[in-house]
Amino acid sequence: MTGHRFRISIVRFIASYFIAVAIAAFATSARAQANIDVDERRTTPVPHRYIHGILGDAKFQIALPDNWNGEFAMGARGFSGDENASGAFKTVGLQKGYAYALSDQGWNRFTIIDQPEDKYYESRRRILQLTQYTKALISRYYGKPARRTFMVGGSNGGHNTKMMVEDYPEEYDGGLAGYGITSHIEWMGSNTRFVRNFDVIASRIDDIIVKRTARPNWDPATTPLSPPLTPDQLQALLNIYNMPAHVGGLAFNIGRVPGSEYRWPPASAKWPLGSYTAILGYATTSVAKFDRFYDPNGDGVLSLDEIKAWDPNLSPPPVANDLRRFDNTGDLQHPIIIGHGSHDPIVSPGETLVYKRLVEARFGVAGARKLLAVYFIPGMGHGGAEYDAALPAMFNALEAWVDYRESGGRTGSPPPNVLVGGLGSYPRN
């Protein structure tokens, strides 16, 4: 090649390179542009600027309090929620001065089956996208960046909180993860196992609840009801208590705990806290999306009985390969506080127990206590007034813990051995 041609080639290469960089920068900028449909002043729970819009294909809300504490609480919604399903996290956060944001994550539980482009895994990208967008907005609005950013959320949002703090330690300084899923594939499998086994014991659930209430340590295998359960009924009851599962190489029990039976039936005047219908609903709206191969009789439609029979252990490898990407790992660099109801029928307390073990497997028991604090709330189901009333104390504990870690113990404090909430006190697990 002549020197002239060589110089032309170099010039073309450099020009092409900078054009590519410019295009990439433009694309990134375009992706970060939000379409705002509401930007207004609101006064409850405290005076703040409220913004609503769409970023990518995800709807969002942002709240910027007048009395800003210099920090940012990034929310994560529940499995059935949207960008407005903030629960008490927004209320308490704004009252304490945090800027707050929440995304619908680009998918909806009730329509995702009809939207091929929507994926559960999209949550990670959409949460990160809104986090970065809100941080930039905070800097412009208040004239300085947020000093800290926390992830907060319950249920699916509790899972997302753990996921984002694990995966993006440069973005988040810690999190409040309420009653969260640890493995989505195991959680959905536990839902179908629950409903198909509950159907077998449904005619005897009143007797089971009465017996458990009278004798909290009752063992149905050794102390029969009168009249006794049939062998099939006894096995079905035991199947609800004991559901083998695994995540991150650890085996655990994702079953529903003894003592929570009053939360199992369909909700009714007699059993107002019953959750059967809700658990069945998760399965009916989700199994076909979780497992695109599942169609036992090949007719292209999943019947209710087929949905109840789904078992992820029998699904082909691509199902686990896809959904296991969503498993929490326990790989923390910043602290997380978890609150979970001891009688939760929707997300088994076993999911939080195994998450604690995941962290311990990486850092040892002593090391895990420097990164994770777990509090079980006696008798609470899937979230509730007890958790909401404890949120101010949890925010305070997280702030003090981060202070303690960042200062090398000179300021702040580790998480309390007993968390004193508004409706009770809860020992650290």
Located regions from the model:
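N-terminal secretory signal peptides that target proteins for export/translocation
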Residues: 1-11
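Bacterial N-terminal signal peptides
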Residues: 13-25
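Sec/Tat signal peptide C-region and signal peptidase I cleavage site
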Residues: 28-32
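C-terminal His-loop and adjacent cap/lid subdomain of alpha/beta-hydrolase
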Residues: 33-429
